[in-house]
Amino acid sequence: VSALAALTGGPEKAGVEPIRRGERSLSAVTFALTARTSGFPLTHHSVFFSDDYASEFDALTRRRSMPAVPTTYVCAQDRDDLGHLPAGVDRERMLFILNAPADGDTRTFSTKETGECLTQALTHLSACGLTVDQAGMEFSPTTPDRFHRLFPGTGGALYGRATHGWTASFRRPGARTRIPGLYLAGGSAHPGPGVPMATLSGMLAAESLAEDHASTRPSRRTVISGGMSTA
């Protein structure tokens, strides 16, 4: 929702302020790809953590750079939770997500830098025992500057305001805006990111809409003896 100010003509119109750079959540470098894998069967969702979290987040938050060994989320889109692939699938579809600074409004990733990010991710996966065969691999990247172009004013931040401190969720915008008929829901609105929180956000938006548009349903017209039609 941080893009609303840029998309609607300013924060005064929507009532949602853009988030300052230091208060943004993380962005990401993502790769939608198809490739063969070996080593062990992936489940539908897998996270390959860096063995040096302190160094990773020092790079992301202080040095504003990509970490050398990135924690890599892999969604194996063709697999079920038991790691089974449908019969006949050779190269499986995957989505890689690597954390990145939300600096898409001030920095553009070159083709070389994007390729280095993929190489670092593949090297990390290999060290964890998963080999992604690069022969015949096809991929499509999305970088923070691309996310910023899709959602102006965000720097590419994917989760709205950073969740620092116990009051962070209360600083996120609520469901209502100043624009009639526009309600906010999702991970960047109150109460915050993650499927359970986003579900609550959707429920709050639905409740707000119902309250704002509540009306008494008229009774069905009828005629009673000795009286008059009622509505």
Predicted regions: what they are:
Residues 1-87, 226:
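Mid-domain catalytic core of redox enzymes
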Residues 187-213:
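A conserved FAD-binding loop/helix module that cradles the flavin
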Residues 38-39, 67, 88, 109-149:
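Flavin-binding catalytic cores
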Residues 2, 6, 34-36, 88-124:
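Conserved FAD/dinucleotide-binding core of flavoprotein oxidoreductases
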Residues 82-91, 173-178:
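Short glycine/proline-enriched loop/turn "hinge" motifs that connect secondary-structure elements
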Residues 28-30, 79-82, 167, 187-197:
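Glycine-rich phosphate/pyrophosphate-binding beta-alpha loops
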